[in-house]
């Protein structure tokens, strides 16, 4: 109960997330992905309101991608490269999810794709779909099924599981 689940998009957000975790009065998990990121020391730390997401607009959005961790920047960069208008959401909190932003996103009446490079079951897409269970909205989900993934390079495993950014953009083309 009251467990906060989060995953920062970069080193700066990670430092602020840990600062937020120590300041909160709740059990708090900060997930981090395989691989590494460049360290960028914060000169000062700021609290991130628990359960809030942030939006990034690329061009004139025709679709929404909800993702987290380093994939936020990967999707933004790939959208710019492909000249695709997207609203990219940094879903830095899985629990609680940002219900206010979800309602605002639904009002935009754009196709929504949840892009997670982790197991879908019990992940962000599950939390969003659970929240939207009584609504008639179309959400597309890319993620790893409920099975063991063998060892390998991050790139080869993402291709194998259908969760590379190339796979994401193939999926987006189907809905665009």
Please report, for each region that a protein language model flagged, where it lies by residue.
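Conserved thiamine diphosphate
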Residues: 1-23, 171
């Amino acid at each position: 109960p009251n467990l906060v689940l989060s995953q920062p998009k970069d080193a700066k957000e990670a430092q602020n997330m840990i600062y937020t975790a120590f300041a909160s009065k709740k059990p708090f998990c900060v997930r981090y992905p395989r691989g590494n990121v460049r360290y960028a020391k914060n000169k000062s730390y700021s609290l991130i309101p628990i359960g809030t997401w942030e939006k990034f607009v690329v061009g004139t959005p025709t679709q929404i991608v909800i993702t987290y961790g380093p994939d936020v920047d990967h999707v933004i960069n790939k959208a710019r490269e492909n000249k695709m208008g997207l609203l990219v959401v940094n879903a830095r909190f899985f629990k609680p999810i940002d219900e206010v932003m979800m309602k605002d996103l639904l009002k935009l009446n754009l196709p929504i794709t949840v892009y997670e490079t982790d197991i879908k079951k019990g992940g962000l897409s599950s939390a969003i779909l659970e929240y939207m269970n009584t609504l008639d909205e179309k959400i597309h989900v890319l993620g790893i099924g409920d099975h063991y993934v063998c060892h390998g390079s991050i790139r080869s495993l993402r291709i194998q599981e259908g969760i590379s950014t190339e796979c994401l953009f193939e999926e987006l083309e189907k809905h665009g």
